[in-house]
Amino acid sequence: MRSIIADSKRLVVKVGSSLVTNDGKGLDHAAIGRWAAQIAALRAQGKEVVLVSSGAIAEGMQRLGWNKRPREIDELQAAAAVGQMGLAQVYESRFTEHHIRTAQILLTHADLADRERYLNARSTLLTLLRLGVVPIINENDTVVTDEIKFGDNDTLGALVANLIEGDALIILTDQTGLFTADPRKDPNATLVAEASAGAPELESMAGGAGSSLGRGGMLTKILAAKRAAHSGANTVIASGREADVLVRLAAGEAIGTQLIARTARMAARKQWMADHLQVRGHVVIDAGAVEKLRDGGKSLLPIGVIDVQGAFARGEVIACVGPDGREVARGLTNYSSAETKLIHRKPSGEIETVLGYMLEPELIHRDNLVLV
């Protein structure tokens, strides 16, 4: 089996905390130097690389003299602010050895949830790649709160892969890859060498939390691969402890787990809607509406809405939830939550009678709706 990375030109590489720190006690400068050297080798092959790197909080803890990861959000944010300085400095110095310029980009969910800011971030990243710069991305932990976090850098890596229409996402971790069961508990567990991204059975194989240094366990990596597949990006989950793992993957060696994007690439606008981690609200729709959305590719009409939850404005992304509580789709609503509460369960012909006006006959037009 040949590595999918060999034929991939635009890569997003995510490196976990344990691979760039000294067991959580500050940054491992030598390890970061090795990552810089490998990425330089990929660049020499004509590949474009965006790096998503953890390590800021661990470096901040070291600089502040803290031995234990704090629980309070303000202390975590302070550690991130201090640590980002060191993280940027080390990466810059190590890449300079290879005559490569780097750029630091700190993102929040709000940056990608707003369409204009999303497009601006995309334009900036593509310009940096065109200029031969290696963007180094992290979540802006200094300003985000729990409610608006990406949650982990695996998810952030997938979102960046979609943002720049990357060919592949490489998630480097301290684990060999995905196993059929927890190898620490099941001696019969075997490595999953290749599977389809988003295959339902993968989530049951994963599970479990990440280390205390980072936030992402294997389940977050599986879900990240599913998300990256929205834009057609394949994913490799591999051990960063393997010597020259990036160079070997680029040479075609199959290492770790390959998750192949087999579904059709979403249109850019629909990718953006699907990638919303938080939505303003949701509507509960009846079984008939679920069937029409899933099988018929229809728009969502007010008559198919059973209930309205949350507060949202016109033009915001909302979720559509079936009677069983599972999300079916999401899309841009033509009506606010207040308006939707007045017109739900009513035929479109009555919208003007109820509201005094009719913006559109649909609550969500099919062109602004994506199945999830």
From Swiss-Prot:
Gene3D superfamilies: Acetylglutamate kinase-like, PUA domain
EC top class named in words: transferase
PROSITE patterns: GLUTAMATE_5_KINASE (PS00902), PUA (PS50890)
SUPFAM superfamilies to which the protein is assigned, alphabetical: Carbamate kinase-like, PUA domain-like
Subcellular localization: Cytoplasm
GO cellular component: cytosol
Domain (PUA): residue spans on this chain: 280-358
Top-level taxon: Bacteria
Pathway named in the protein's UniProt entry: Amino-acid biosynthesis; L-proline biosynthesis; L-glutamate 5-semialdehyde from L-glutamate: step 1/2
GO biological process: L-proline biosynthetic process
Binding residue positions for substrate: 54, 141, 153
Main location: cytoplasm
EC number(s) recorded for this UniProt protein: 2.7.2.11
Name of the protein: Glutamate 5-kinase
